[in-house]
Amino acid sequence: MALNLQDKQAIVAEVNEAAKGALSAVIADSRGVTVDKMTELRKVARENGVSMRVVRNTLLRRAVEGTEFECLKDTFVGPTLIAFSTEHPGAAARLFKDFAKANDKFEIKGAAFEGKIQDVEFLATLPTYDEAIARLMGTMKEAAAGKLVRTLAALRDKLQEAA
């Protein structure tokens, strides 16, 4: 279906707004994936705060100009599915990685975070906010417990020497 100039400008503006509000972006090629599976992917994406869209490469190049995802321009070859993570930087990467495991024809082309091209594995393994807080609390708790054990051991040694 041919798009007129106003439609193209609207698409560019919409994708540009999504890019400006996103934490990360992941690019994929979904050729060969059934409509049912893509519909399921879109549903899961919405639940995880990920906005997905298939966009023509020329429009996508214009849409990402001036954003931190401009570094992805070289990956805009062939059919391009772009996903922007708005709530967590690793959400789209994790979603696409899991989907690619179940669907051989789904190919992840690239990802960007903080203005740089990143490995999808790196983004997919980023901890969520809650996971990061839990890790930090665990580390702090371990440090406090270790300090207590060392203090008690030193006190025991001091008492043994005095006896």
From Swiss-Prot:
Origin superkingdom: Bacteria
PROSITE patterns: RIBOSOMAL_L10 (PS01109)
GO CC annotation terms, alphabetical: large ribosomal subunit
GO molecular function: large ribosomal subunit rRNA binding; structural constituent of ribosome
InterPro entries: Ribosomal_uL10 (IPR001790), Ribosomal_uL10-like_sf (IPR043141), Ribosomal_uL10_bac (IPR022973), Ribosomal_uL10_bac_type (IPR047865), Ribosomal_uL10_CS_bac (IPR002363)
GO biological process terms held by the UniProt record: translation
CDD domains, sorted: Ribosomal_L10
Pfam families (UniProt xref): Ribosomal_L10 (PF00466)
UniProt entry keywords in alphabetical sequence: Ribonucleoprotein, Ribosomal protein, RNA-binding, rRNA-binding
Subunit structure: Part of the ribosomal stalk of the 50S ribosomal subunit. The N-terminus interacts with L11 and the large rRNA to form the base of the stalk. The C-terminus forms an elongated spine to which L12 dimers bind in a sequential fashion forming a multimeric L10(L12)X complex.
Classification via HAMAP family: Ribosomal_uL10
Similarity section: Belongs to the universal ribosomal protein uL10 family.
Function: Forms part of the ribosomal stalk, playing a central role in the interaction of the ribosome with GTP-bound translation factors.
Protein name from the UniProt record: Large ribosomal subunit protein uL10
Gene assigned in the entry: rplJ
